[in-house]
A protein has these predicted regions:
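Aromatic- and carboxylate-enriched substrate-binding clefts and catalytic-loop regions
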Residues: 1-169
Length: 169
């Protein structure tokens, strides 16, 4: 991994990173995780998958953030917007899912619609309304659409704000 070549840059030319905030502890608990430029996703996953397929009895893989995160890259030499990132993510998911003897069950987090073609499992799917001001009722649209098509789950109960309401979903 080359910091200069493979890591996403922000618009002010800094390297982009992700941190995880814990509302319980009221501080950042995750280390700085560097975001890989979308153009290099396929490159990294191709190298990884060659080694991964050599493992015995492997039938699936979780590629969490490929289901939700689209990173722009403001590198001066190779700038990419979120639409470019979506194309790169789809290409990576197609390679990861494989076909024939190399086919894997893929699991993602969030599961944006462009991932549905390649995945079998979605975690943290939004099972409720978007809560837009013009919404009169909460309709579990995503659950209705995906039911029977793939396995999906919403937010874990211990992460919900209202456990009783979450049980009803």
């Amino acid at each position: 991994l080359s910091l200069r070549k493979h890591v996403v840059k922000t618009i002010d030319d800094r390297y982009s990173s992700k941190r995880e905030y814990s509302p319980t502890m009221q501080k950042y608990v995750g280390y700085y995780q560097l975001a890989i430029s979308p153009a290099y996703l396929s490159h990294f996953y191709e190298k990884f998958m060659k080694k991964y397929h050599k493992l015995d009895n492997v039938t699936g893989i979780s590629v969490g953030t490929l289901g939700t995160a689209l990173n722009s890259d403001f590198d001066d030499d190779e700038p990419y917007n979120r639409e470019d990132a979506r194309t790169f993510v789809k290409r990576a998911l197609e390679y990861i899912a494989g076909s024939g003897d190399q086919a894997l069950d893929v699991m993602v987090d969030g599961g944006n619609v462009y991932t549905w073609k390649y995945v079998r499992h979605i975690l943290n799917a939004p099972l409720d309304s978007s809560r837009y001001i013009r919404s009169s009722y909460s309709v579990p649209f995503l659950g209705v659409v995906l039911h029977g098509y793939m396995n999906f789950a919403g937010t874990p109960l211990n992460m919900e704000g209202d456990v009783e309401y979450a049980k009803l979903k």
